[in-house]
């Protein structure tokens, strides 16, 4: 009987973990925080976020573009993105996030020529970079 209680607690924890991941997916977080929908054909390669009770801190999500998808008219339409160099603040954000999470598929610092789009909302920042050579999007978030 005493063994039953720890087993039930472990099972409850596992259920809460999987239900939480289903409810609070990366895509739902981008929609809730930034109003961005992730189109079909973008495959999440990596995702990192700081553990935080309030959801603040750094996040990094890397998406790979699958063959023959149209991104026209979406947030990820790199034809509408800026090609100018990165600002010092943007480079600092990339360095901070990269140093914190050490992603396997991270972008080179300083990044080679990339397409970029930045959104600022509620004091937070979302920096989206598209690397045409890698055919990947890198989303750097700083939630305050």
Model-derived regions, located:
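Hydrophobic membrane-insertion alpha-helices, especially the h-region
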Residues: 1-19
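Extracytoplasmic electrostatic interaction patches
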Residues: 83-144
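Intrinsically disordered, low-complexity segments enriched in proline/serine/threonine
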Residues: 8, 41, 112-113
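N-terminal export/targeting and maturation segments
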Residues: 13-82
């Amino acid at each position: 009987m005493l063994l039953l209680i720890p087993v039930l607690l472990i099972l409850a924890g596992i259920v809460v973990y999987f239900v939480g991941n289903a409810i609070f997916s990366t895509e739902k977080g981008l929609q809730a925080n930034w109003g961005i929908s992730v189109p079909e054909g973008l495959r999440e390669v990596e995702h990192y976020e700081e553990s935080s009770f309030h959801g603040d801190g750094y996040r990094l999500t890397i998406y790979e573009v699958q063959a023959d998808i149209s991104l026209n008219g979406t947030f990820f339409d790199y034809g509408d993105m800026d090609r100018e160099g990165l600002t010092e603040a943007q480079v600092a954000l990339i360095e901070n996030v990269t140093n914190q999470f050490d992603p396997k598929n991270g972008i080179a610092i300083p990044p080679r020529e990339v397409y970029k789009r930045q959104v600022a909302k509620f004091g937070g920042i979302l920096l989206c970079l598209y690397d045409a050579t890698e055919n990947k999007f890198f989303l750097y978030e700083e939630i305050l």
